[in-house]
Amino acid sequence: MLRVAINGFGRIGRSVLRALYESDKRDKIEVVAVNELSQPEAMAHLFQYDSTHGRFQHKVTHDQEYPYSDVPDSSQDKVRILHQADLSLLPWQSLEVDLVLDCTGVYGSKSDGEKHITAGAKKVLFSHPGGSDLDNTIIYGVNHDTLLPEHRIVSNGSCTTNCIIPVIKAIDDAFGIDSGTITTIHSSMNDQQVIDAYHSDLRRTRAASQSIIPVDTKLHKGIERIFPKFSNKFEAISVRVPTVNVTAMDLSVTINTNVKVNDINQTIVNASRCTLHNIVDYTEAPLVSIDFNHDPHSAIVDGSQTRVSNGHLVKMLVWCDNEWGFANRMLDTALAMSK
């Protein structure tokens, strides 16, 4: 049994714990503690009632001994709540923590990870892109087989790298990619304003519900980290749109082989049934973004939107639940790190 602690109980931290209870991994992973600076009452309430993913299927309570406890079925699973701002003072050693899932979105450097190690954790997995000095960056389904036992401080990439990189790999393996561009159409996030208010990014001073808002992205750097051969070959832009969840990615690539639409789509279908099973899905149904809410795949390719120009320029539409799909990959990578 892998003993896990979650640091940061926001959108991803809560989704990871919920995903564990909806998965077949509860006999492999035990969450023993959550570190979060907010109050236990708010933590329990937000875990029980979620505007995006609905009510948690079991009753959630909190008490003094175990300020957070979840009660599934007839047994009681108890998870310790901590409120420690200093990572090096967390009681990971006494709790015998094997792996910390750092879901704060704040920490991501090797030195941050070392603080968890100093506190007694054996390994750390960041839920966001980390520095180049980390032991590894994993996009599960693409390079998780590169994990080594000595890799202690690892990044799980981002929701968008987990969405687009498996698709890039499938197309590149089949036809060879020369270069590409990506537009990320991302749902609003909590670093945006409800109404116009001050922010260091002037575009993000504007109300999230009123505009499509361009934001900076380093997605191309994430692609280069996994595929060094694509250095200076990809560029990306990103916009936030007034929805609460689910992201669409507009991928355009130039390929070395002359292809037709069916060639591209069949490649994705084949990958979804074999090498990328449970990672990439495929659909041609006339769906919209909300239909992908709570989808556990990293990516869902909408084959009805695939286009090919002049045999070599390929455009694809790829969906993902940027919370739920990524949370499920955190669990997959956690287990891969335990081997």
From Swiss-Prot:
It is found in: Cytoplasm. CDD domains: GAPDH_C_E4PDH. Its main location: cytoplasm. Pfam families: Gp_dh_C, Gp_dh_N. It comes from Aliivibrio fischeri (strain ATCC 700601 / ES114). The gene is epd. GO terms for cellular component: cytoplasm. Belongs to the glyceraldehyde-3-phosphate dehydrogenase family. Epd subfamily. This is D-erythrose-4-phosphate dehydrogenase.
